[in-house]
Protein backbone atom coordinates (compact mmCIF):
# COMPACT_ATOMS: atom_id res chain seq x y z
CA UNK A 1 0.00 0.00 0.00
CA UNK A 2 1.15 3.48 -0.81
CA UNK A 3 1.10 6.21 1.78
CA UNK A 4 0.25 9.86 1.37
CA UNK A 5 0.73 12.95 3.49
CA UNK A 6 -2.43 14.20 5.21
CA UNK A 7 -3.07 17.42 7.14
CA UNK A 8 -6.37 17.90 8.97
CA UNK A 9 -7.20 21.50 8.09
CA UNK A 10 -10.00 21.64 10.67
CA UNK A 11 -7.51 20.91 13.46
CA UNK A 12 -4.71 23.11 12.10
CA UNK A 13 -4.07 26.22 14.23
CA UNK A 14 -2.09 28.03 11.50
CA UNK A 15 1.11 28.24 13.55
CA UNK A 16 3.13 27.87 10.32
CA UNK A 17 5.75 25.58 11.89
CA UNK A 18 5.31 22.97 9.15
CA UNK A 19 5.67 25.64 6.45
CA UNK A 20 8.83 27.00 8.06
CA UNK A 21 10.36 23.55 8.55
CA UNK A 22 9.30 22.05 5.24
CA UNK A 23 8.30 24.57 2.55
CA UNK A 24 8.76 21.83 -0.06
CA UNK A 25 5.70 20.04 1.31
CA UNK A 26 3.53 22.67 3.03
CA UNK A 27 2.15 26.15 2.35
CA UNK A 28 -0.39 28.37 4.05
CA UNK A 29 -3.87 28.70 2.56
CA UNK A 30 -4.53 31.88 0.61
CA UNK A 31 -6.47 33.28 3.58
CA UNK A 32 -3.77 32.14 6.03
CA UNK A 33 -6.29 30.17 8.08
CA UNK A 34 -4.55 26.78 7.88
CA UNK A 35 -1.64 24.95 6.27
CA UNK A 36 -2.02 22.88 3.13
CA UNK A 37 -0.10 19.93 1.74
CA UNK A 38 1.45 20.90 -1.59
CA UNK A 39 2.01 17.32 -2.79
CA UNK A 40 0.51 14.39 -0.83
CA UNK A 41 3.08 12.06 -2.40
CA UNK A 42 6.09 14.14 -1.39
CA UNK A 43 9.36 12.50 -0.47
CA UNK A 44 10.81 15.59 1.23
CA UNK A 45 13.00 14.57 4.17
CA UNK A 46 11.75 17.49 6.27
CA UNK A 47 8.21 16.05 6.52
CA UNK A 48 9.03 13.95 9.59
CA UNK A 49 10.27 17.07 11.41
CA UNK A 50 7.03 18.87 10.54
CA UNK A 51 4.95 15.93 11.79
CA UNK A 52 6.82 15.72 15.09
CA UNK A 53 6.69 19.46 15.81
CA UNK A 54 3.03 20.09 14.97
CA UNK A 55 1.50 21.34 18.25
CA UNK A 56 -1.95 19.92 17.48
CA UNK A 57 -0.70 16.72 15.80
CA UNK A 58 -2.79 17.26 12.67
CA UNK A 59 -0.21 15.95 10.16
CA UNK A 60 0.24 12.26 9.46
CA UNK A 61 0.96 9.64 6.84
CA UNK A 62 -2.11 7.70 5.71
CA UNK A 63 -2.44 4.49 3.73
CA UNK A 64 -4.25 4.56 0.40
From Swiss-Prot:
Residues 3-31, 34-64 form the 4Fe-4S ferredoxin-type domain. Transmembrane segments: none annotated. Binds 1 [4Fe-4S] cluster. It holds the Pfam family Fer4_13. GO terms for molecular function: 4 iron, 4 sulfur cluster binding; electron transfer activity; iron ion binding. It comes from the Bacteria. Keywords: 4Fe-4S, Electron transport, Iron, Iron-sulfur, Metal-binding, Repeat, Transport. [4Fe-4S] cluster binds at residues 12, 15, 18, 54. Its cofactor is [4Fe-4S] cluster. Homodimer. PANTHER family: FERREDOXIN (PTHR39163:SF1). Ferredoxins are iron-sulfur proteins that transfer electrons in a wide variety of metabolic reactions. This is Ferredoxin-2.
Amino acid sequence: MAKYLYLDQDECMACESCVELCPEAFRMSSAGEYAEVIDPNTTAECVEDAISTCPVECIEWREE
